Amino acid sequence: MMEEISLQEKIEKLPLGVACIDGLTNGGLEAGIITEIFGEGGSGKSNVCMLAACSALRLGKKVVFIDSEGFSSERFLSICKADNSKLKVIRVFSLDDQEVAITKFSKIIEKDASYGLFILDSFSEFFRLERTGDNQSRVIDFQRQLSLLSSIAAKRKIPVLITNQIYQDIANGDILPFGGYVVDHIMKAIYRLERLPDGRRKMTVMKHRSVKEGNSVEFRIVQDGISCEVKNGN
């Protein structure tokens, strides 16, 4: 299968509706690629996923949200007042579940143009928990699932958003996303989330095709989502 690419073709974006994040991402999540957000627990990864889902729902799109982190319906409803009847939240409990879910919805989305976003929160949870020491087998599993996700993004021209956990490189102390090069080289956009003092969060561009790496914004997680106001007491 081949497709000619037009240089005049407009790149579609899904804005999150948060000015500071939409500014950082140059308009939102890019369609046709996988975007990765990584960071420590509690840094705001799931909140960003929920905001993205809500944004797509407001546009009348169907959304698939595959969850391994413990999706909070209460939190989602506090963030999103849009009609959620087109949101499909699928809880997975193992690496096999995750692959079955990705495979199932890749086939559904390929035939249904009403889907506008695919979310996997978190991609690496079960790879981390179920690793057996067989690195080659794990790499093959990584590649197979990432290939399916890339296919969803490219064929249907929708954003695919995944979250990833972190580890510390014992050689130099760097904080890196789980999966290393195997995951990194497939991602076209990567953002890091960090927890800062006073409840602030920081989002940094680590890799992007059209945004300068190292650019960052700060925000707060609030009752109804994310606030770009970071002054104390707000």
From Swiss-Prot:
One GO MF term: damaged DNA binding
Alphabetized UniProt keyword annotations: ATP-binding, DNA damage, DNA recombination, DNA-binding, Nucleotide-binding
Family, per entry: Belongs to the eukaryotic RecA-like protein family. RadB subfamily.
SUPFAM superfamilies: P-loop containing nucleoside triphosphate hydrolases
NCBIfam families per UniProt: recomb_radB
PROSITE patterns (alphabetical): RECA_2
Gene Ontology process terms (BP): DNA recombination; DNA repair
Role according to the record: Involved in DNA repair and in homologous recombination. May regulate the cleavage reactions of the branch-structured DNA. Has a very weak ATPase activity that is not stimulated by DNA. Binds DNA but does not promote DNA strands exchange.
Stored InterPro entries: DNA_recomb/repair_Rad51_C, DNA_repair_and_recomb_RadB, P-loop_NTPase, RecA_ATP-bd
Sequence intervals crossing the membrane: none
Name of the gene this protein is made from: radB
Entry protein name: DNA repair and recombination protein RadB
Keyword Protein biosynthesis set for record: no
